[in-house]
Each structure stands twice: as C-alpha cells, then as structure tokens.
UniProtKB/Swiss-Prot annotation:
Residues 340-425 are annotated as: Disordered. This is DNA mismatch repair protein MutL. The gene is mutL. It holds the Pfam family MutL_C. Residues 387-400 have a biased composition (Low complexity).
Length: 644
C-alpha cells in the first residue's frame, strides 16, 4: 500500500482552521463579514468570556435557504464566485468558502436562518459533524452561535491570551469593520455589557467619534482625491494629535479592512516633517479601485493585499495629504478647559491676515555667536531695530478657536489604545445616538486659511529658550531652536538638491574605512552619492577617500555629514536619493541652529521670526516637534475669568 493518502474532509478542515481561525477575533471577523455580504443593515455581536465561551452574531440580512445550509459548511462552497474570472473581480468580503467549515470543525455551532420566504432552518454542528437539522420559525436573517471554541484542539486553546487581550483583539476588528461600513449599524456586547453602538447612517465621522472620542473627531480633517484608477476618501488628524502606535491608522480597500505597511508609510510620508519621531496620526483612509488592480487572494485571513499600480497609489496618497496640510494653519492651540460655549457670532469671527508669499530659500541672515552673554553687543543684519509692539486701537473681537476643549499635543506616557473598552452610560439607544449625532453635527470644518504664518511681534524671551510674541490673535510661544532648525533645514534641503561645481578642498583628505560588505554596498551607490555632491575615490581594498566637499557644508561638520551619508547608504536596502538628501539636510540644520539657554537681542528675535515666516512650513521642525503654540486672547480672558 502506498504511503501517500488523501486526508478526509474533517481533518482537512482542522488543518485549514489553523490559518483561518487563529483566535476568537478571527471568528467574529469572518461571521460579521458574511453578514455584510448578505446585505445586512443591522448586526449584533454578543460575546461571553471574550468569545472563548460563546460568540453570537445576529443580523437582518438575506438569510440562507434550507437547501444551502448543509452545503455552506462544506469546504470551498460559496455563493460569491462561480469561475476564475470572478476571482479577479471580487467585490464581496468573503469568497474562499473556508470560514464556515473551519469554524464548525473546532467548535459547537448552532445556526438559525431564514430567507423570509419560507420557514427557517435550525442546524446544529459539533466538531464538524451535523447533529441536528430541522425547520423552525424564524425572522428573516441569520442567528449563528459558536460555543466552546477550540474544544477539540487543546493545543490551540493553550496558546490563547488573557480574556482582556482576546477581547481587545475582537474590539479592534469590530472597530475597523465599523469604519469600513458606516452604513451598517453595529452593536457589540461583552458579558451583556455594551461596548459599541454605531447608528448605521453612513456618517463615518460618527463612527470615529464613538471609537476615538468627540475631542479627536474635532481634530480630523477630510481627505479626498481622485485619479484615473483610484478614489481616496477619509479623515486624518491634525499633526498635534498623535499616538505612539500605528494601530490608529486604518486602511480600507473596496470596503475591506487591510493591513498594508506601504499604505501606512504613505500616510506618514504625507505628514512629512509634521510628526515627531515615534509618533503616528489617527487616520481612516478608504480607497476604491477596479478589483482587477488589487489581489485579495493572498492569505486565507484576507487581511493582506497586493496592488498592481502600487507606486501610483502611494504617490496619490502622499500628495493628497501634503496638499491638505498646506491649506490649513497648523499652530496648535494651548487651549483651556471650558464649558461648552454659547454660539456667539462675535466669537465665531475669524481674523484674516494678508501675508507675503514665501521667497526663495536662502541662508538665514541672522548672525549669532556660539557663546553669548546678555550684556554683549551682537551683530544683526536686520535693517530696522525691533520695537515693542503696540496693539491697534480697535475693539477686540475674540477669535474662534477650532476646539476650545482640546489640549495641545503632549507626548503621553500612557496613550489610549484602540482596544480600550468603552461603556455607554445611557440605556436608551436612540437617545445615545441622537446625542452623538448632535455633537458630531456641531463639529465645525477646520478652516482652510492657507499655510502662511501671521506677523508676530516679539515681547520677550524666557530661559534663553522660548520666545514670546503677540499679534491681534493672541499670544505665541516659540521654541527658538526649533524655529531656526526649520529655517536652516529648508536652506540645506535646497542646497543638497543641487550638484554644484563649487567645492572646498580638504587640507587633509578624509579617509573612510569600511568592512568588505559595507565597501561593496557603497561602491554600488557611488553615482547616487554624486547627486548630493559627495565624490568618493577608492583607496585600497576597503577604503574610500574624500578630497573635497560642496562649499555649503557647514564649517567644522564636514566629516560628520560624510559619515551620516555613508551610514544611510549602508543601512538602506535601496538608496533613496530623496531620503538621503533629507537626512543630510536634517542633520546639518540641527547642528547649525541656535541652542537652548542662548539669549538673543530683540533685533535677533525679530529677524528670526521674519525668517520663519518665509519658510514653507513654519509650524514644525524637521523632526516633527511643534515650533510654536498659540494662546488666543479669548482663552487668556477665560483663564483670568474676564469672560465667562
């Protein structure tokens, strides 16, 4: 007898379940997606012990006909595709026909379903074996219960995490599905306690508000773009609202939540230098495209996809986000906690500014000595001395703050997570949703005022680190190092992008010794390094020498810049000339900028603020830290109880 044998269906289902049903969250995902494919508009999810004891999904969808109930639990049985052509034009969430038999093979499953045209069907399955099938009275839709998950696979059960962790995985999946399909009302219960309820009215802002809070929803800006192949819609937070994890970014492709690192990277690139290192935005991006352009048949879990025009999509995402941020002022409000203000037309009046357009990048003309004393005379190229600013004689109108209650960005030591349980305090569902709709409806669109910085008039300096300035719109606090870092960065970024013939010879050639692997890596990229003005000559078997450098290299930092470029070339799998220039410009701008505890004269402060206004992004340094924080006059009045 031969050694190779065909496995029976039950064993095959157990093997398939290892990929499809990894944990309770996998069961919830597959069953809820089936409900959505069945045109459900309302879905209830009931859990006990984070789904390990019981998972129950109730929907009002199309239901399953009696003759299809048994077939639905056979391997690769599906109503969603018929031939290989359908496989490349998938519009549904499910299509493989693996989920139901896999779930049934590792649990005790009970199904009650009806199409509404005939009596319902009651089906009981244990470990893949059909125990009972009978007709029953049932409303239209499907009610499916999964109990004792992994009862017959103790090895899999042993690797389950704590109840809290498994519940977190489930809520994370349900949140993503809720964002993907705001037109479907979702209710999530755990041990009879309600964790989530969405209205199903199609407004994704309400879903985002119910998941992340009204305060976060107020800091969202809409994103929308369209090309020949792609349509993008969504919301992302202002740069001041960040989290310590990428888990707050959700990407949806043709209604399907997917985990795709390159899409998340594109969102981050869209923020460019607006985000601090190690911080990530909250974002929801829905992408619609021809199914022929995306392959969803990559993994049984259907969370991974491949794009046939990936680079075009990534470029569209980056450009769309960058364009959106250029249209708004990104000065974070310091904010004070206030009660919900009355709607006052005077409060809602926004100050308008007329600014000069940023001029072509040039090296900042502020002359600052490395060591400075308050009593020393300093040199500055400002033609007119700064004078204390006198406010115009006019009746003050408090400006509108985007969100009074929101605090400016602060790195939180305990960031909130998507997996945090949320309990709804009201027992009246309609009241809860009406209240949420009202709050979301009151969220005002963030005004697109352009990216110009209003004129600022210095009034002082604190600890040789922070500059205080004012204008009609209130008080501004500026980080002087971050401000000049932004000025220098835009200067060096422009210079690094040019290959100039003007070079400075080194008195002693700089020698770079590398390992053989590093040497070969750098040797491959010699032409790329020339594009940033760095010319290397081979010297021996594993070394290079540099005899000259561009004249714009900051004096005394030549070798550090060369070493930084070498490190980037060795570290990156594929050298990106744009990133190489970026890293070099960031490093040079940081080292060339004034530091903390360095006192400036009024003229130097005024010159610094004027230079800052000429930059294309005066709101964050190249590392993403905020340059300035705004206290509106209205907020200051509130702090001192001058207005109520």
């Amino acid at each position: 007898m031969g050694k190779i044998r065909k496995l029976d269906d039950q064993l095959s289902n157990l093997i398939a379940a290892g990929e499809v049903v990894e944990r309770p969250a996998s069961v919830v995902k597959e069953l809820v997606e089936n409900s959505i494919d069945a045109n459900s508009t309302s879905i209830e999810i009931h859990l006990e012990e984070a789904g390990l004891s019981k998972i129950r999904i109730i929907d009002n969808g199309d239901g399953i006909a009696e003759e299809d109930c048994i077939v639905a639990f056979e391997r690769h049985a599906t109503s969603k595709i018929k031939d290989e052509n359908d496989l490349f034009r998938i519009r549904t969430l499910g299509f493989r026909g693996e989920a139901l038999p896999s779930i049934a093979s590792v649990s005790e499953l009970e199904l009650i379903t009806s199409t509404g045209d005939a009596p319902g069907t009651h089906l009981s399955i244990k470990g893949g074996d059909i125990i009972k099938q009978e007709k029953t009275a049932s409303r239209k839709g499907t009610d499916i219960t999964v109990q004792n998950l992994f009862f017959n696979t103790p090895a899999r059960l042993k690797y389950m995490k704590t109840i809290h962790t498994e519940l977190g995985n489930i809520t994370d999946i349900v949140y993503r599905i809720a964002m993907s399909h705001p037109e479907v009302s979702l209710k999530l219960f755990h041990n009879e306690k309600k964790l989530l309820h969405t209205s199903g009215n199609g407004d994704v802002r309400q879903v985002l508000a119910s998941i992340y809070s009204i305060q976060v929803a107020k800091k969202l800006i809409p994103i929308e773009a369209e090309s020949l192949d792609f349509t993008i819609k969504g919301y992302v937070t202002l740069p001041e609202v960040t989290r310590a994890s990428r888990n707050y970014m959700s990407t949806i492709v043709n209604g399907r939540y997917v985990r795709n690192f390159v899409l998340m990277k594109a969102i981050q690139q869209g923020y460019h230098t607006l985000l601090p290192i190690g911080r990530y935005p909250i974002g929801f991006l829905s992408i619609e495209m021809d199914p022929m352009l995306v392959d969803v048949n990559v993994h049984p879990a259907k969370l991974e996809v491949r794009f046939s025009k990936e680079q075009e999509l990534l470029k569209l995402i980056e450009e769309t986000l960058q364009s959106a941020f250029k249209k708004i002022q990104l000065i974070p409000d310091a904010g004070v906690t206030t009660k919900k203000k009355e709607k006052d037309e005077s409060v809602q009046e926004q100050f308008k500014f007329e600014h000069t357009k940023p001029r072509e990048s040039s090296m900042p003309n502020i002359v600052l000595p490395t060591g400075m004393d308050e009593k020393q005379e300093e040199t500055t190229t400002v033609k007119q001395p700064a004078q204390l600013w006198q406010p115009p004689k006019q009746e003050w109108q408090p400006p509108q703050s985007l969100v009074r209650e929101e605090q400016s960005w602060q790195p939180s030591s305990k960031p909130e997570t998507v997996r945090e349980e949320k309990e709804w305090t009201s027992n009246d569902d309609d009241f809860e949703l009406e209240e949420l709709e009202e709050e979301v409806g009151e969220i005002e669109e963030i005004e697109m005022n352009g990216n110009d910085l209003p004129p600022l008039y210095p009034i002082g300096q604190m600890h040789g680190t922070y500059i205080f300035a004012q204008n009609d719109n209130g008080l501004y606090m500026i980080d002087q190092h971050a401000a000049q870092e932004r000025i220098n960065y835009e200067y060096f970024r422009d210079k690094v992008g040019r290959v100039t013939q003007e070079v400075q010879e080194l008195l002693v050639p700089y020698r770079i010794d590398l390992s053989l692997t590093e040497f070969l890596r750098v040797e491959e990229q010699l032409e790329e390094l020339k594009k940033v003005g760095l010319f290397l000559e081979q010297f021996g078997h594993q070394s290079f020498i540099v005899r000259s450098h561009p004249t714009w290299f900051p004096k005394g930092q030549e070798t550090e810049i060369i070493d930084e470029m070498m490190e980037q070339v060795v570290k990156l799998k594929k050298v990106d000339i744009k990133k190489l220039r970026e890293e070099a410009a960031i490093m040079m701008s940081c080292k060339a900028s004034i530091k903390a505890n360095q006192y400036l004269t009024n003229d130097q402060i005024f010159a610094l603020l004027e230079e800052l206004r000429t930059t294309t992004n005066p709101y964050t340094c190249p590392h993403g830290r905020p340059i300035l924080v705004h206290h509106s006059t209205y907020e200051l009045e509130k702090m001192f109880k001058r207005v109520m």
